[in-house]
């Protein structure tokens, strides 16, 4: 397992959000959680090979609109763990990780937004977690 400790991924002026962790060591998701905890959640899912930083300009607007904004870095991307096994970066592993994350955070009435691979993951999550997802934007 490799966790990114590159200086370029920390202390970013345009991305001043606290990093939270979910999952076991070696396959933990890094994510940000901004806005009121009881507000309606929106989950922003990035494409590959980028990371949550791609959403830096929209996060403040969504928080200002009164939403709870959650932005996970997919496994193998950004600040999330980078398991050495190729299968750990596959669609199934990403879906399992994100599904468990949504369950453990108790997300409901969630809007999922995805771009690129994040769009495919959002679509699949909307099916797998239909009781938690209210809206889908691709």
Predicted regions and their residues:
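Acidic donor-diphosphate engagement hotspot in glycosyltransferases and nucleotidyltransferases
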Residues: 54, 94, 125
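Active-site loop/oxyanion-hole signature of alpha/beta-hydrolase fold enzymes
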Residues: 26, 32, 71-113
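Alpha/beta-hydrolase fold catalytic core
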Residues: 1-42, 64-67, 107-108
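Conserved hydrolase catalytic core segment
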Residues: 107-138
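Conserved HGGG/HGGXW glycine-rich cap/lid loop of the alpha/beta-hydrolase fold
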Residues: 32-81
């Amino acid at each position: 397992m490799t966790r990114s400790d590159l200086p370029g991924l920390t202390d970013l002026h345009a991305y001043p959000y606290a990093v939270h962790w979910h999952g076991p060591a070696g396959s933990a998701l890094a994510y940000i959680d901004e806005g009121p905890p009881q507000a309606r959640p929106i989950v922003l899912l990035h494409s590959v090979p980028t990371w949550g930083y791609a959403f830096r300009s929209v996060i403040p607007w969504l928080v200002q609109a009164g939403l709870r904004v959650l932005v996970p870095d997919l496994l193998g991307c950004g600040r999330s763990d980078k398991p050495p096994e190729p299968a750990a970066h596959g669609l199934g592993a990403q879906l399992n990780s994100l599904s468990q994350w949504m369950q453990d955070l108790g997300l409901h009435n969630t809007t999922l937004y995805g771009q690129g691979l994040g769009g495919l993951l959002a679509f699949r999550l909307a099916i797998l977690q239909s009781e938690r997802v209210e809206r889908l934007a691709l």
